C-alpha cells in the first residue's frame, strides 16, 4: 500500500534565497519555536512523518533537540507532546536537515502545533571565530552555539523566542537585507505529514 504524504507550505523561498539565521551566543536562551496552524487539507494525512529544518553550521556536525507542543488559548506552547526530546544533527554547510519521526506516531493537533528547536550549549556545538571592532586593530575571539536556524521574510509572524521572561513573539525587524526589511523573520521549518 502506498503511503500518502503532504508537506506544509509556509516558506516559498528556495534555500539560496534564505539569508537570515537565528544564531545564539553562550549564556543566551537557545530555544525558538514555529507555529503551524491546522488546516482541513491535513485531515487525510494526520501523522507528522518528518520535520524539515533549514540549518547552517561551520562545524562538521552540530546537535540540537526538537520538542513538539500543543498551544494554549493565548497562542503559546503549553502541553508537551513528545515525552523526550528528538535529538537531531545538522551537518556542515547550509542545508535542509530532515528528521524522520514516523515511529513516534504523533498526530497533528486540531488546535495547531509548535515545533521548538533547542540548541545545546556543549563543547561540540561551539564555533569560535576571530573579529575586529571597526576602527580598532585589536583582534577578539567570539563564539556562537551552532547550528544556526534559517529564517525567511514574511508579513505574518509565526515564530517565538524564549527569553528570560518566557516566550515572546518575534517582531518586525529592521534589516540591511532588502528582502527582509520591515518583515517578520520566520523560522524555515516545514512538516511532512502522512496517512500512517
Enumerate the language-model features and the residues they cover.
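Beta-sheet-rich sandwich/jelly-roll-like modules and their strand-loop junctions
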Residues: 1-71, 118-196
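Aromatic- and Gly/Pro-enriched, solvent-exposed loop/edge beta-strand patches characteristic
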Residues: 63-139
Amino acid at each position: 500500500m502506498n503511503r500518502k504524504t503532504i508537506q506544509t507550505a509556509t516558506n516559498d523561498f528556495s534555500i539560496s534565497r534564505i539569508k537570515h539565521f537565528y544564531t545564539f551566543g553562550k549564556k543566551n536562551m537557545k530555544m525558538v519555536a514555529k507555529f503551524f496552524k491546522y488546516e482541513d487539507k491535513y485531515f487525510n494525512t494526520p501523522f507528522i512523518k518528518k520535520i524539515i529544518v533549514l540549518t547552517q553550521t561551520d562545524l562538521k556536525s552540530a546537535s540540537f533537540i526538537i520538542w513538539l507542543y500543543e498551544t494554549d488559548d493565548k497562542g503559546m506552547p503549553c502541553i508537551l507532546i513528545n515525552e523526550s526530546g528528538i535529538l537531531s544533527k545538522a551537518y556542515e554547510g547550509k542545508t535542509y536537515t530532515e528528521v524522520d519521526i514516523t515511529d513516534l506516531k504523533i498526530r497533528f493537533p486540531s488546535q495547531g502545533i509548535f515545533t521548538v528547536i533547542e540548541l545545546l550549549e556543549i563543547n561540540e556545538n561551539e564555533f569560535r571565530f576571530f573579529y575586529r571592532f571597526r576602527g580598532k586593530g585589536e583582534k577578539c575571539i567570539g563564539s556562537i552555539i551552532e547550528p544556526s536556524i534559517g529564517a525567511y521574510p514574511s508579513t505574518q509572524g509565526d515564530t517565538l523566542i524564549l527569553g528570560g521572561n518566557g516566550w515572546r513573539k518575534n517582531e518586525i525587524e529592521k534589516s540591511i537585507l532588502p528582502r527582509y526589511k520591515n518583515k517578520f523573520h520566520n523560522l524555515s521549518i516545514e512538516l511532512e505529514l502522512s496517512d500512517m
